A protein has these predicted regions:
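Hydrophobic positions on the alpha1 helix immediately C-terminal to the Walker A/P-loop
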Residues: 34, 38
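Hydrophobic anchor at the beta1->P-loop junction of P-loop NTPases
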Residues: 23
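Accessory nucleic acid-recognition modules appended to NTPase machines
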Residues: 183-343
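Catalytic cores of nucleic-acid endonucleases
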Residues: 326, 350-395
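Interdomain motor-coupling "hinge/lid" segment immediately C-terminal to the ATP-binding subdomain
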Residues: 121, 126-230, 263
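Short glycine-rich substrate-engagement loop in P-loop NTPases that contacts/grips substrate
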Residues: 54-84
C-alpha cells in the first residue's frame, strides 16, 4: 500500500480533533485507502481498532442505512456498545439521504472523531454549509502522481528506468487499481473505460437527473478531445448545430459544471497578468486522469503536448497551488501558480526542438518583471535554462521535492 504521505502530512494535524475530515475526489482515486491509512496511523498512536466504526455505503450490506435517521440510530447504538470515544469512517457518504443532518447530530451528541469521503464537489455546498459551516476541513484526493506511480510500477517491473516508467504513465495514468492488473494494457483500458462509464452514469447523469444522454456524451467527448485548449461554449454550440443538435451555451456550461462537480474535469480560469483580473471566458479544462482519456478517446501520444500539460497541472493541484492560465499582451503562460506567499510560473512543451519553439516558450516571460521562479518544462534531456528562467526535464520536475 502506497503511504500517500503528501496527503497524510496535511491530514495528520487534524487527527483526533472535533473537526470533520472530508476527503473528496473522482471515483476510485484512492479515498478508501486514505481511510485505511488514517486508521493505521491512529492504531499506531495507541487508539484501539475496537473504537472504529467503518461503513462503505456502496456495500449492499449497508443499504438499510441510506437515510439519515437509520444511520444515526445505528451509529448511536454501536457507540454505546463500544463506550468511550469512537472513530467514524464513512465512505461515499453522498449515498445517504440527508447525511449532513446525521453527521452534525453525531458530532454534537457523541464523543467522536469523524472522517468522510465523497465523489462529488457539491458535498460541501448547500445543506452541508448550513449544518457544518466552519466545522470541517476538506482534502481533495487525486490519482497517483508520477512519483507514486513509479513506486508501484517498479514493484512489478523492478528494472524499469525512469524513462520507461514515464512512458507507461503517459498511457496508463494514475488510477490506483491498475497496479492490481499489473498495468497490463488490455485489462487496464477495460477497467478505465468502465470507470469512466460509472462516473458518467452515477456521478453525473443520475445525480443531476440528466435525460439527454446523447448530448452529455457529445459534450464530454469534445472536452476530452480538447483538454488544455481554450474552450468556448458558443463555439461548441455551433459545432453541435452542424451535427443537427441545437443547444444553448448555458446548457453546455451546466453539463460541464456537473462533470467538474464529479471531478472528471477541472476548470482553469484565464488571468490578465497586466490588469490583474480573472477573465470571464475562454477557460481551459483538464481531465482528472489522462489514462482515462487514453482508454476512452486514445491519442495521448499524438497529443503529447496537451497530455504533458495535463500531468503538470494535476501535479500543481496535488501540491496545493491555485492555478490560472496567464495572459500578458498577446502571449500566454500555461500556469500561474499561487500558494499563500509562494508564486511560480510554468510553461510546458513537448520538445524545445527549434529556435522558434525556444523563443516562444522562454519569450512568454518577457513582460513578467517579478522575481518569482519561472520554469520551462519539457522532455528534453539537456538543461537549456537562460536569462534566469529555469528549464527542467518534466520527469525531474514532477519528482522534485520542491520547486525553487
Amino acid at each position: 500500500m502506497i503511504k500517500r504521505e503528501l496527503y497524510m502530512r496535511r491530514i495528520r494535524p487534524f487527527l483526533g480533533t472535533e473537526l470533520i475530515k472530508v476527503m473528496t475526489g473522482i471515483r476510485r482515486c484512492g479515498k478508501s485507502v486514505m481511510l485505511e491509512l488514517i486508521q493505521q496511523e491512529l492504531t499506531e498512536s495507541g487508539v484501539s481498532s475496537a473504537q472504529f466504526i467503518a461503513i462503505n455505503f456502496e456495500d449492499m450490506s449497508y443499504s438499510h442505512l441510506q437515510t439519515a435517521q437509520a444511520l444515526h440510530d445505528e451509529i448511536t447504538k454501536r457507540a454505546k456498545e463500544i463506550g468511550g470515544k469512537v472513530y467514524l469512517f464513512f465512505d461515499e457518504i453522498q449515498e445517504v439521504k440527508d447525511w449532513e443532518k446525521c453527521i452534525n447530530s453525531l458530532r454534537v451528541s457523541l464523543d467522536c472523531d469523524i472522517y468522510i469521503t465523497g465523489s462529488n464537489a457539491k458535498l460541501l455546498f448547500g445543506e452541508l454549509a448550513t449544518y457544518l459551516g466552519g466545522r470541517y476541513v476538506e482534502f481533495v484526493i487525486y490519482p497517483f502522481s508520477f512519483g507514486e506511480f513509479m513506486e508501484l510500477y517498479r514493484s512489478i517491473a523492478p528494472d524499469a528506468s525512469i524513462q520507461q516508467c514515464f512512458q507507461k504513465y503517459l498511457l496508463a495514468g494514475g488510477m490506483p487499481y491498475l497496479a492490481n492488473l499489473r498495468y497490463a494494457d488490455a485489462p487496464s483500458k477495460q477497467y478505465l473505460h468502465d470507470l469512466f462509464n460509472s462516473v458518467q452514469l452515477k456521478d453525473i447523469m443520475k445525480r443531476n437527473k440528466i435525460r439527454d444522454v446523447d448530448l452529455l456524451e457529445r459534450i464530454i467527448a469534445y472536452v476530452i478531445a480538447n483538454v488544455g485548449t481554450t474552450f468556448s461554449a458558443t463555439s461548441l454550440a455551433k459545432f453541435l448545430k452542424n451535427e443537427q443538435r441545437t443547444v444553448a451555451p448555458e446548457t453546455i456550461l451546466n453539463y460541464i459544471k456537473y462533470c467538474c462537480e464529479a471531478y472528471l474535469f477541472y476548470q482553469v480560469k484565464r488571468e490578465d497578468l497586466q490588469g490583474k483580473q480573472i477573465l470571464a471566458s475562454n477557460e481551459k479544462y483538464y481531465i482528472a486522469d489522462h489514462g482515462i482519456r487514453e482508454a476512452v478517446f486514445g491519442g495521448n501520444m499524438r497529443d503529447i503536448n496537451l497530455i504533458l500539460e495535463n500531468i503538470v497541472y494535476l501535479e500543481l493541484l496535488r501540491r496545493g497551488y491555485e492555478v490560472t492560465v496567464g495572459r500578458t499582451g498577446d502571449k500566454e503562460i500555461d500556469f500561474v501558480c499561487d500558494k499563500r506567499d509562494e508564486k511560480l510560473y510554468v510553461q510546458v512543451c513537448y520538445l524545445l526542438a527549434s529556435d522558434e519553439t525556444v523563443n516562444r516558450e522562454f519569450g512568454a516571460y518577457d513582460s513578467i518583471r517579478d522575481n518569482f521562479p519561472k520554469y520551462v518544462v519539457s522532455l528534453d534531456e539537456f538543461d537549456m535554462s537562460r536569462n534566469g528562467i529555469k528549464h527542467r526535464n518534466i520527469r525531474d520536475f514532477l519528482l522534485a521535492e520542491e520547486w525553487n
